[in-house]
Every structure is written in C-alpha cells, then in structure tokens.
C-alpha cells in the first residue's frame, strides 16, 4: 500500500483542514463580535496606526534635545521646588541646566570652591555663604557646634583649649584664595557671607563682582574694612566683631570711620559685637545719608554713643538686641537731639534696668510711631514710665516683659493720644482683674488689640469645660 492510499479522506481529518485566515481568527473567536473585527481592520489600515508604528521606533530618543538650553531652563523654572532634585537626576544636560537655576548656596566644603566646581556647576549664583566652609572639619567627630549662622564639627579634645574655634578656622591666605576663585566665576554675585578674610581678598572680590550689594563679614576688624571702599554698590552690610565663647576681633572708631567714608550708599547696617564710641557712630550718620535701618547687637561701645544717633537724618528703623547695657552715661539731656525720620524702635533680649540709658534712648527716639519690646529683662514700671517721652506712638508690642505691671502699662499708654494698635503677650504681672475703667475704655477705641498677658490664665480659660487639666482621680479611682 502506497503512502497516498494511506491518507485519510475524511473531511474531519486535521491533515485535510484549511489554513485559518485572519478573518477566520476574528470571526471564529468566541469573545469577538463582527463589529469589533471590522473596527480592528479599519484601524489597522488607517494612517494613524502606521504613524504609531513609526513613532515606536523612536521611543528611546530624547526629544528635549531639540530644545535650546534657554527654553529648557524656562520650562524647568515652572516646576515646583520640591522636584528640583528629581530633575537633576534625569541626565547630565538637565543637571547642568538645573545648576543655572540655583541662585543661593551655603557651602560646607572648601575644596568644592577651590577646585572651581562651585562656579562651574552653579554659574548663576547671586548669594553665597562661606562661613561653615571656612572651618577645618574634624575627622571622626560626632560633636556639632552651632551658634546662629555658624555650625561645624569639633573634636573631643577641644574642651581643653579655649581657642579651639579660632584654631579651627582656615588661615587668611586660604580664605582670600577662595574669594579670588569665587570672584573670577561669579560675576552675578549680589550677597556674600564670609569669615576670617583680609583686605586683599575683599579687594580682589570687589574688582570682579562689581554688582555686590550685600556683605556679611564675620570676625571683622579695622584692617579688613580698609578694602570695603572698593564695593561701590554696597547697600547692606553686617559686621560681626567679637562673639563670646567663639572668637574675638576688634572694630573700633577707626574701622567705623573707614566704613562711613567708603560706603556712603548704605541703606541697611548691622553692627554686632563691635566697639566704638560717639565719634564712630557720628561719622556713619554724617556720611551714610541714605541709611534707613540700623541694628546694634551685643555692643561693646563706650558711654555716650546714643547722642550720635541724632545725626542719622534718614534713619527709619532702629533695632537694639542682645545688649547687656544701653548707655550708662549718655551725657546731659539738653545736648541730646532726636532722629527726625525715625519710625520704629525695636528692643529685643536687652537689659533695660539702666535708667539713664533708657531715658536718653527714648528722648532720641521720641518721634517713633512703632515700639516693640520683646524678651527684655529689667523693664519695670519706673523704666517703662520713661516711654512717656514718645509723642506719636500708634503701635505698641510688649512680649516677655515679666516685671511690668498693669498700672505701669496704664500710666504710659493713657498719655499716647494716637495709639491705634496694641499687642501684649506673656507679661505675667499684667492681670485682667486689675484693668481699670479708663484702660477698658481705651481698649474699646483701639483698631487692633492682642491681649494675652498671662498665658497660663488664658490657657485655663480656653480649656474650661473640657475636663483637661483636672486631677486624675476621676480616671484612677481605686477599685
């Protein structure tokens, strides 16, 4: 029997079955209807389908390459700040473009600056803080020393040496070298914070960064201020001389006079831990004619400096903070002038038990409209009574004045005819029960009143009826 004779002739045989077509596949499928089959055929023959097949071949192509860096930068600027780190991880180009967005930087690694990576990675920086990077890092140390804007690691042996902070600082030449590197690459620099720099470093920076407007100099000295005249466009300046427990430096009348003659366009000035006297403050007032804000922190000035404040013709805000004394011997009251444009007087964390200094200060600032006294000790009724010298107070804020009483407050504010707003917080000797009818009548005329003198009584009244703050006998009964 031949092979042909053995072939089965039954139509149901699998060898005689016709090859299935695409129509049979669609039509014979149990879950596919005829309408779905027709729709699939039409979609397969459409140009859009052919376009999809072509575009799928370019799925791995970076389409942002067709965008210029400036256009890509504008797009990335629309993203929220929370996505900045994610954007930098996309590719090297996005990392570079993202670096141009950053405007402010606090540097912790000095080698990152010296190597040039800071200015190449972030070419558009306008604000740079180098203070923390100016300290030699202590290896294998878990002790972190923090003081306001300064923080660095110290070794366990530092407690045996009282000058460990100054010894941890980079030397002057190294700091000046970093300023030269920064100046050559950061032409848009507007603000700089640095410590332990010298006159030469400041001069080199001023030559390259002509737009520098704000400068903060820690461990400042008279010699350093000799190079400040090169910063012609300086508008804001903060000088930190000595800081108790960290480092010591001297800014005397010599430095203040150099500052006054070299920075005549100053609008904002802060003197922290600086020395000086009447002559230095007077020079600033006479030369810096557009100065509007003066801050004096932890001053070490000689007596009589307050009288020089009358030479500031454009001063609008005076802030005195963290001072152990105001002025022990301000001189005769007849010789004290006043600041004609002064609007706001702020006293924070100061010792105000110096009656003569307070009397002189309030007389010089007699034209202020805003008075803010916060967390000051020594402000009793007698000291606060000197505030009657103010003639045009519209806003008063008292916070943390624990010695001042209700009668002491009342005796002063009833003399202020223009008072519109008042804020009294955490002054425990000012009692609600001691408010007189005259004081209550004054409160009703104020436009704004924040009255929380005794926070403990305020908390008790707010929790009344809630059951909170009572003894636990209700919940811990003996069974």
UniProtKB/Swiss-Prot annotation:
Organism (species): Arabidopsis thaliana (Mouse-ear cress)
Family annotation (InterPro entries): F-box-like_dom_sf, LRR_dom_sf
Superkingdom, natural source: Eukaryota
Name the UniProt record assigns to this protein: F-box protein At5g51380
Domain annotation F-box: ranges: 62-108
Region (Disordered) residue spans: 1-20
């Amino acid at each position: 029997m031949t092979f042909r004779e053995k072939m089965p002739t039954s139509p149901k045989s699998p060898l005689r079955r016709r090859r299935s077509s695409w129509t049979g596949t669609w039509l014979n499928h149990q879950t596919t209807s005829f309408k779905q089959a027709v729709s699939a055929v039409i979609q397969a023959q459409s140009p859009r389908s052919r376009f999809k097949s072509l575009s799928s071949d370019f799925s791995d192509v970076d389409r942002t390459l067709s965008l210029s860096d400036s256009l890509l930068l504008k797009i990335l600027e629309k993203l929220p700040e929370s996505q900045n780190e994610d954007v930098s991880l996309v590719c090297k180009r996005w990392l570079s473009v993202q670096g141009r967005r950053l405007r402010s930087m606090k540097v912790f690694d000095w080698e990152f600056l010296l190597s040039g990576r800071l200015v190449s990675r972030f070419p558009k920086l306008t604000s740079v803080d180098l203070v923390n990077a100016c300290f030699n890092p202590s290896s294998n140390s878990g002790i972190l020393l923090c003081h306001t804007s300064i923080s660095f690691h110290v070794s366990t042996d530092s407690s045996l040496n009282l000058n460990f902070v100054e010894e941890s600082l980079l030397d002057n030449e190294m700091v000046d070298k970093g300023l030269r590197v920064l100046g050559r690459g950061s032409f848009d620099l507007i603000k700089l914070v640095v410590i332990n720099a010298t006159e030469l470093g400041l001069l080199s920076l001023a030559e390259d960064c002509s737009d520098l407007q704000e400068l903060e100099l820690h461990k400042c000295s008279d010699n350093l201020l000799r190079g400040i005249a090169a910063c012609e466009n300086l508008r804001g300046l903060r000088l930190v001389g000595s800081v108790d427990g960290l480092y010591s430096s001297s800014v005397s009348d010599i430095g203040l006079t150099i500052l006054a003659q070299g920075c005549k366009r100053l609008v904002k000035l802060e003197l922290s831990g600086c020395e000086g006297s009447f002559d230095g403050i007077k020079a600033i007032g006479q030369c810096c004619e557009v100065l509007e804000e003066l801050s004096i922190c932890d001053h070490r000035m000689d007596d009589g400096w307050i009288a020089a404040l009358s030479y500031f013709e454009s001063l609008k805000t005076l802030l005195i903070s963290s001072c152990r004394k105001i002025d022990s011997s301000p001189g005769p009251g007849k010789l004290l002038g006043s600041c004609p444009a002064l609007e706001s007087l702020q006293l924070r964390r100061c010792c105000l038990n110096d009656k003569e200094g307070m009397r002189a200060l309030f007389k010089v600032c007699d034209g202020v409209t805003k008075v803010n006294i916060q967390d000051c000790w020594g402000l009793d009724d007698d000291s606060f009574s000197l505030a009657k010298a103010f003639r045009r107070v519209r806003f008063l804020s008292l916070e943390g004045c624990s010695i001042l009483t209700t009668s002491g407050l009342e005796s002063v504010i009833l003399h202020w005819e223009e008072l519109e707003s008042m804020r009294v917080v955490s002054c425990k000797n000012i009692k609600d029960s001691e408010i007189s009818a005259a004081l209550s009548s004054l409160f009703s005329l104020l436009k704004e009143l924040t009255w929380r003198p005794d926070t403990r009584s305020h908390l008790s009244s707010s929790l009344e009826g809630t059951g909170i703050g009572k003894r636990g006998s209700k919940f811990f009964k003996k069974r």
